[in-house]
């Protein structure tokens, strides 16, 4: 395959027939060689997929023919290799999980700010700039002077708002996330809580990096993405970070040189959190992956039970690593 096009897309829209879209959408993606995951719910569609330019163009055209799925918000970036292993279309209760009932971006949402106007907004000293992403995302890159809520999941964001933000004190609040979808709900939530002037970066960080010249940019570092690239730089190319296969935390080359790093088994973030049983399981998984690589295959696991357990281990270790990271920062 030539250069791979990675497409992050979403749209909040009433989709009462979302379940009936699943099978034909999956069939279209599989026939076009598109990999990645799309989520469908009664509130819309969300996900990231990858394929050839023609395949992605055809997918967007196919979606536009479905009731309500025209004019989908999407951002394109590129990679030399396919960043996903599988093709999935999942049915969900929400396309982005905040855990608060009744939040509807179709009814109320913050003010969209174009990337070209973002610098001016966040340079206003009266504006509180809040990063709505998770702690491990913030660690590798964020906007200058942005507040880090130190959340491990988006579900924790409402609690952060209740504990740290006040409509009477914070008159102007600007928020951002990777592609814009989390801000649809976070700004809607703030509006529901009585905040008056609430803004968010239209298209998210990815759109900002695409449209704003690097010499004019207020972005510092790289942007975490939820695929095998781990992070992208300002040119939207694969960045310098790798990812620990045990805990999923982004890691640098320096961290990979640490004695705590064992490929597929541990890294400095999670080495103290892994049990001996988990270590043995990770070592076996890595061995199978290496064997598959020698055969020119992608190891995705033939034992369903082992795959499920591995995912549970990854989530558990990620949580522990994030807590460890937060505690380390708090203790400074």
From Swiss-Prot:
EC number: 1.14.-.-
Residues of the Rhodanese domain: 123-217
Active-site residues, record numbering mapped to chain: 177 (cysteine persulfide intermediate)
PROSITE patterns, sorted: RHODANESE_3
A GO MF term: oxidoreductase activity, acting on paired donors, with incorporation or reduction of molecular oxygen
Function summary: Catalyzes oxygen-dependent 5-hydroxyuridine (ho5U) modification at position 34 in tRNAs.
Family per similarity comment: Belongs to the TrhO family.
Record protein name field: tRNA uridine(34) hydroxylase
Organism for this UniProt entry: Shewanella woodyi (strain ATCC 51908 / MS32)
Gene name per UniProt: trhO
């Amino acid at each position: 395959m030539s250069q791979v096009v990675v497409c992050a897309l979403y749209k909040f829209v009433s989709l009462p027939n979302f379940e009936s879209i699943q099978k034909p959408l999956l069939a279209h993606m599989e026939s076009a060689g598109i990999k990645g995951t799309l989520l469908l719910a009664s509130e819309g569609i969300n996900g990231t997929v990858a394929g050839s330019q023609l395949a992605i163009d055809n997918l967007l055209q196919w979606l536009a023919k479905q009731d309500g799925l025209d004019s989908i918000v999407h951002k394109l970036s590129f990679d030399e290799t396919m960043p996903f292993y599988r093709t999935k279309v999942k049915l969900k209760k929400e396309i982005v999980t905040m855990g608060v009932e009744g939040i509807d971006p179709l009814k109320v949402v913050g003010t969209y700010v174009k990337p070209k106007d973002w610098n001016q907004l966040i340079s206003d000293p009266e504006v509180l700039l809040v990063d709505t992403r998770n702690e491990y995302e913030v660690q590798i890159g964020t906007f200058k002077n942005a507040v880090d809520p130190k959340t491990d999941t988006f579900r924790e964001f409402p609690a952060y708002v209740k504990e740290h933000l006040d409509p009477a004190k914070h008159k102007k609040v600007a928020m951002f996330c990777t592609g814009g979808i989390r801000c649809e709900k976070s700004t809607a939530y703030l509006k529901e809580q009585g905040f008056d002037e609430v803004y968010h970066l239209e298209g998210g960080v990815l759109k900002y990096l695409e449209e704003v010249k690097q010499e004019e940019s207020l972005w510092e570092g790289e942007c975490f993405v939820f695929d095998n690239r781990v992070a992208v730089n300002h040119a939207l190319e694969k960045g310098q970070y790798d990812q620990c296969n045990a805990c999923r935390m982004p890691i640098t080359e320096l961290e990979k040189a640490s004695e705590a790093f064992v490929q597929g088994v541990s890294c400095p973030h999670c080495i103290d959190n892994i049990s001996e049983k988990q270590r043995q399981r990770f070592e076996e998984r890595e061995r199978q992956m290496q064997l598959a690589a020698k055969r020119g295959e992608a190891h995705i696991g033939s034992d369903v039970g082992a795959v499920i357990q591995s995912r549970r281990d990854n989530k558990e270790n990620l949580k522990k690593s994030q807590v460890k990271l937060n505690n380390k920062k708090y203790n400074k």
